[in-house]
Amino acid sequence: MGRGKVQLKRIENKINRQVTFSKRRNGLLKKAHEISVLCDAEVAAIVFSPKGKLYEYATDSRMDKILERYERYSYAEKALISAESESEGNWCHEYRKLKAKIETIQKCHKHLMGEDLESLNLKELQQLEQQLESSLKHIISRKSHLMLESISELQKKERSLQEENKALQKELVERQKNVRGQQQVGQWDQTQVQAQAQAQPQAQTSSSSSSMLRDQQALLPPQNICYPPVMMGERNDAAAAAAVAAQGQVQLRIGGLPPWMLSHLNA
């Protein structure tokens, strides 16, 4: 027959109780070590003897860390449960606080706008005045700072525009010099062309005039011919004969001239 179920109860005999404690304690610590090694679990076992003596086991002797982890998980779970139970009551309290804060802010805003001042006493009005003066000083200071920054930025732009203007003026002067030089060169070329155009007709006129003068001189009788001395009667006859001969020579020469020269001579 099999063994019956053993009833667990306190051992009355002190000696037997001490022996059983020693056996079961060693078995418990051994089992804790086995489960820690086999299952890679963090195990902590704390045992106090009937006389108050401490026996313990901890994985890798890290009892403090295991207990700290236990407390963190235990208290976190308790805090979550308590927070859920208290949150419902806290919502109403938070709502009342936020509502009162909103009302206070709205009231201060009205006071700053100059509204609902009847409920304020002299001291509160003085505090409000000081607050407004302080705010006004901050506003003026901020405004002045922004204006100075704007002026500085405008001055920088002005200097940049002045430098750009100087560069453009310099470029314009250079271009004007180039244009004037080109105009002077063009005028000089035009003057040379006009001078050459005027010189050609004058040369043609002078050449034609000189040729006509040479022709006219060729037609005139020679003045340096020496005639022998003759008597009075003979002189008249000789002069008449010479005139007739010269006229004949002139007519012969004129007959050999071109028509345009004949018209010039007749004129």
From Swiss-Prot:
Keywords on record: DNA-binding, Nucleus, Transcription, Transcription regulation
UniProt feature, compositional bias: Low complexity: 182-215
InterPro entries found in the cross-reference section: MADS-box/MEF2_TF (IPR050142), MEF2-like_N (IPR033896), TF_Kbox (IPR002487), TF_MADSbox (IPR002100), TF_MADSbox_sf (IPR036879)
Ranges for region Disordered: 179-215
Compartments, as annotated in UniProt: Nucleus
Limits of the K-box domain: 88-178
Main location per the UniProt record: nucleus
Gene Ontology CC entries for this record: nucleus
MADS-box domain boundaries: 1-61
GO biological process: positive regulation of transcription by RNA polymerase II; regulation of transcription by RNA polymerase II
Gene Ontology MF terms in the entry: DNA-binding transcription factor activity, RNA polymerase II-specific; protein dimerization activity; RNA polymerase II cis-regulatory region sequence-specific DNA binding
Known role: Probable transcription factor.
Subunit composition and interactions: May interact with the K-box of MADS1 and MADS6.
UniProt-recorded name of the protein: MADS-box transcription factor 15
Organism expressing this protein natively: Oryza sativa subsp. japonica (Rice)
Highest classification ranks of the organism: Eukaryota, Viridiplantae, Streptophyta, Embryophyta, Tracheophyta
Gene: MADS15
